[in-house]
C-alpha cells in the first residue's frame, strides 16, 4: 500500500489538476501541462526573488501576485522558444517593469510577449481560480502551512503560465513510434 501524500503535496496535485481542467475547458490548454527542464530550471533560479516580491504584496493584491507568477512562466516559455542561449542567464530584474514588481504584468505583456489580447485574460482567469482554490483550503493565515500552500500556488501558476505559452507557440506532446 502506498503511503498517504502529505497535505501540501496533495494540495499541489489537486490545484494542478483543477487549473489544468479549467484551462483545458476554456481552450487555453489541451489536457496536458507542457513543460521543459530549461523552464523548470529557470523557475528554480527566479523563485527566491519572486517569492520575496509576492509575499510582500500578497495580502493587498493576492490575485495580482499569482497572475505575475503565470506571466513570468509565459515570458520564460516565450524566451525559451525565441533563443534560450541568449536569454537563459538574464536576471530576474529583466522581467520587472520600471516600478519593479508593481508593473511586472504590463512589462511582460507589453515588452516581452507583446500580446495583451491572449495573455491578460488567461492570467486573470487562472489567478482568480488559483486564489479561490487556495482560500477553500481554510488554512490559518500566518501559519507555516498557509505559507507552504502559498508557495505551491505560486509555483503551479508559473508552470501553468509556461504551459499556456508553450501551447500558444504550437508545442504539443505527440506519441512517437520507436519501433522498427
Mark where each language-model region is.
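Intrinsic-disorder/low-complexity detector
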Residues: 1-180
Amino acid at each position: 500500500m502506498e503511503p498517504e501524500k502529505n497535505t501540501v503535496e496533495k494540495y499541489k496535485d489537486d490545484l494542478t489538476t483543477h487549473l489544468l481542467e479549467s484551462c483545458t475547458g476554456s481552450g487555453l490548454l489541451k489536457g496536458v501541462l507542457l513543460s521543459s527542464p530549461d523552464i523548470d530550471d529557470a523557475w528554480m533560479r527566479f523563485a527566491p526573488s519572486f517569492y520575496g516580491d509576492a509575499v510582500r504584496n500578497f495580502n493587498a493584491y493576492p490575485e495580482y501576485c499569482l497572475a505575475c507568477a503565470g506571466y513570468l512562466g509565459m515570458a520564460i516559455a516565450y524566451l525559451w522558444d525565441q533563443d534560450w542561449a541568449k536569454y537563459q542567464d538574464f536576471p530576474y530584474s529583466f522581467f520587472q517593469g520600471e516600478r519593479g514588481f508593481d508593473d511586472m504584468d504590463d512589462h511582460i505583456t507589453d515588452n516581452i510577449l507583446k500580446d495583451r489580447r491572449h495573455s491578460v485574460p488567461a492570467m486573470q482567469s487562472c489567478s482568480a481560480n488559483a486564489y479561490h482554490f487556495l482560500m477553500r483550503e481554510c488554512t490559518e493565515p500566518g501559519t507555516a502551512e498557509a505559507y507552504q500552500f502559498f508557495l505551491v500556488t505560486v509555483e503551479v501558476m508559473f508552470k501553468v503560465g509556461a504551459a499556456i505559452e508553450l501551447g500558444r507557440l504550437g508545442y504539443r506532446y505527440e506519441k512517437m513510434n520507436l519501433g522498427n
